[in-house]
């Protein structure tokens, strides 16, 4: 009873803190010069990480096994992974706007985990025989960490695409306006066109465009490195899962839905890393592959659980109302 109450308290404290954190991050994005809200949000995210760590330890003691046996526990661990990825760059780079994505991911996953939809699996249960192995920590933790890293990296790529295509849209819109002006041969219009050209050239080198260019470079830089880290975790998770499957079921690979989609996820991000080796495919082209990978991860992690079939069906659940 004590552990259950403590778990309930830690869950709501961490969710409340991360809700405040994402609000402060939005304020920081609206006003880039506001430093104090940013520092407060980072300290709040560290507090969230500590609360989630305490929550996982409490559930571990309460249940008697590592808390990765069902979808609820995996969502809490995913939130913990997001918060870990969030605070690591903070200790290296004190000011980093990219952490807004990880804060949003944390509040989304934790909000879903603590919602009424997963009420039926909030209480710890006895592990099924297939999960009573030392490989549980190795395999499942690596897979969840890989999902967290790959999702964060993919979201950075999505942001890169949005900013890039937005710039292209406004640039083409401006060019169409200039072409319309060229259809008139009046001296006054010609003068305005020349003035617009000078303005455009000046604007190109303005502080706003310089900041956008730097921000796009940061998005590309971090997405590549975070996805590379996630790909390593995914590879380790798949290999350890194959060894565990051989011990539990007598075969390294069975092509059940979860294994199939994990393999598809691995292929997609292997293609992404390959595109990074080609200079002509970097930037928006590789970001498109990562965006596809974002959808594939959610199918692999969450979508397959809705089916409730295959060797990994113990992680499935039924949607219920609160």
From Swiss-Prot:
InterPro entries associated with the record: Cyt_c_assembly (IPR002541), Cyt_c_biogenesis_CcsA (IPR017562), Cyt_c_biogenesis_CcsA/CcmC (IPR045062)
Bilayer disposition of the protein: Multi-pass membrane protein
GO cellular component, one term: chloroplast thylakoid membrane
Membrane recorded as keyword: yes
Annotated compartments: Plastid, Chloroplast thylakoid membrane
Spans through the membrane: 9-29, 44-64, 71-91, 98-118, 143-163, 226-246, 253-273, 287-307
Gene Ontology molecular function: heme binding
Alphabetized UniProt keyword annotations: Chloroplast, Cytochrome c-type biogenesis, Membrane, Plastid, Thylakoid, Transmembrane, Transmembrane helix
Presence of keyword Thylakoid: yes
Primary subcellular site in the record, as a coarse category: plastid
HAMAP family per the UniProt record, alphabetical: CytC_CcsA
Record note on quaternary structure: May interact with Ccs1.
Record function comment: Required during biogenesis of c-type cytochromes (cytochrome c6 and cytochrome f) at the step of heme attachment.
Entry's family note: Belongs to the CcmF/CycK/Ccl1/NrfE/CcsA family.
Protein's name according to its UniProt entry: Cytochrome c biogenesis protein CcsA
Lineage: Eukaryota, Viridiplantae, Streptophyta, Embryophyta, Tracheophyta
């Amino acid at each position: 009873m004590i552990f259950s109450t403590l778990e309930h308290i830690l869950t709501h404290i961490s969710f409340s803190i991360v809700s405040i954190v994402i609000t402060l991050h939005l304020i920081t994005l609206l006003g880039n010069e506001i430093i104090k809200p940013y520092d407060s949000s980072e300290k709040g995210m560290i507090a969230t990480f500590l609360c989630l760590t305490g929550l996982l330890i409490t559930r571990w003691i309460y249940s008697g096994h590592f808390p990765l046996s069902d979808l609820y526990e995996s969502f809490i661990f995913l939130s913990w992974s997001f918060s870990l990825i969030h605070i690591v760059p903070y200790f290296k780079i004190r000011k980093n706007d990219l952490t807004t994505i990880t804060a949003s991911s944390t509040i989304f996953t934790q909000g879903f985990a603590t919602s009424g939809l997963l009420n039926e699996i909030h209480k710890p249960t006895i592990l099924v025989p297939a999960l009573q192995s030392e490989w549980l920590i190795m395999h499942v933790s690596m897979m969840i960490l890989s999902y967290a890293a790959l999702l964060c990296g993919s979201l950075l790529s999505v942001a890169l695409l949005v900013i890039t295509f937005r710039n292209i849209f406004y640039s083409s819109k401006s060019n169409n306006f200039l072409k319309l002006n060229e259809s008139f041969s009046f001296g006054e219009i010609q003068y305005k066109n020349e003035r617009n050209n000078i303005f455009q050239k000046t604007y190109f080198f303005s502080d706003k465009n310089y900041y956008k260019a730097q921000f796009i470079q940061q998005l590309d830089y971090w997405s590549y490195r975070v996805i590379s880290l996630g790909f390593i975790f995914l590879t380790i998770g798949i290999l350890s899962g194959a060894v565990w499957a051989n011990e539990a079921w007598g075969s390294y690979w069975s092509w059940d839905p979860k294994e199939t989609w994990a393999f598809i996820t691995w292929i997609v991000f292997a293609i992404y890393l390959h595109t990074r080796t080609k200079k002509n495919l970097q930037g928006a082209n590789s970001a498109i592959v990562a965006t596809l990978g974002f959808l594939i991860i959610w199918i692999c992690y969450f979508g397959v659980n809705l089916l409730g079939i295959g060797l990994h069906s113990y992680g499935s659940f039924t949607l219920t109302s609160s």
